[in-house]
Amino acid sequence: DVKDKVDEERIESLRRTLHDFANEFYSWGFVKYDVKRIAIQLNKAKVELTREKLTEILSREFNYKPKNSGITQSVFNSTIDKIMRTLEITDEYYTKKLTQKIFSEEFKQQINNTLEKETGYVQLTIKKYVSKVYFDNDIVSKVFKSIDIFNKAIYLDDPFVLDRGPVNGVFSKVFERNAYYGHQDNLCELIYGNQEDYNLVDKIVADERLEKIMNKMQFACKGKVFFKDNREMLYKQDNVLIPFKVANLSTGLKTFAILQTLLLNGAIKDGSLIILDEPEIHLHPEWQLLFAELIVMLQKEFNFHILLNTHSPYFLQAIEVFAEKYGIDDKCEYYLSYNEHEESFVKRVTGNLEEIYAKLAKPLQVLENLRYADE
């Protein structure tokens, strides 16, 4: 929700200003428990809030009396000025800055096309709603009609994210003021940040749809992921006395462990958007078939929106076959990416997958030609 994010940004700015002011002459207890409340109050009243009203609120909340205070009138007035400037900044400006932070972190400040200096844009179309973000020199120049999306996107591209754990991952960042981080830190937060929910749901597993998925997953992931002392993530199989630390699992098993954890702790919900970047890379061919079937089952049971990228004709065919088996082939769209004249294009090839298979088969044909070249 863009409005909520903008409000969070403004409230955080107000909180920092109030924190600095309060810290001049109040205890840390006040700063910790009351400043955030005042910031929220000011943000709610921003439209009708005048300088006089703001002065009245701060004087009352901080019990500020110029003659009896150790803080000068100039410092108080400076705080009032800063708060008024913060409240006068438009939602559009905050939206722009928020978008900039997210894109800069995800793409490491390299957003625009490196081959040309033209204005670039990213467009998102959801049914009849269209949103565009324009970029010049890697800086957001305009946000056109931002869309509120209430389901968080989950991007899985690296099973080794499990090795980072909560200490080296997101928990080291949650205390940073106004921190924005990339998709792998976000994934760490979803894995390690919902431990209480995981333990609760794991005990009841009342959803028949989830049981279907877990039963199918047992063919590869024969154990269960759990947290020791709400901190360390371990993996336990029934026939093994001592549980494994997740860092010691095979790369393929880590892929299934991540999926199992996200399902059981409620991070993935009905209608979630899941982005899978070449999930077959670390999987044995037999497990590739299983993972493809799980993806199709998840879409059917939970109505997930799944964006899948693969370079494997084997894995692609598995998706195609299982989609037909489970009756969701009419929901699948297929696209082929290709380069032409130093530009990248994406072409819709639904109903004509031969184009994809032909392209993916070219390297094998090269080997075949080399093998029989001297015959």
Region spans (language model):
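Phosphate-coordinating catalytic segments in nucleotide- and nucleic-acid-processing enzymes
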Residues: D1-L264, K269-G271, S344-E375
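Short N-terminal micro-motifs specific to bacterial/archaeal maturation
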Residues: V240, A247, H282, I306-L307
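Walker B motif beta-strand of ABC-family P-loop ATPases
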Residues: L273-I275
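C-terminal lobe/lid and adjacent interdomain/linker elements of RecA-like ASCE P-loop ATPase modules
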Residues: D4, R10, L289-E375
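Walker B catalytic acidic pair
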Residues: D277-P279
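Short alpha-helix boundary/capping motifs
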Residues: D207, Q288-L289
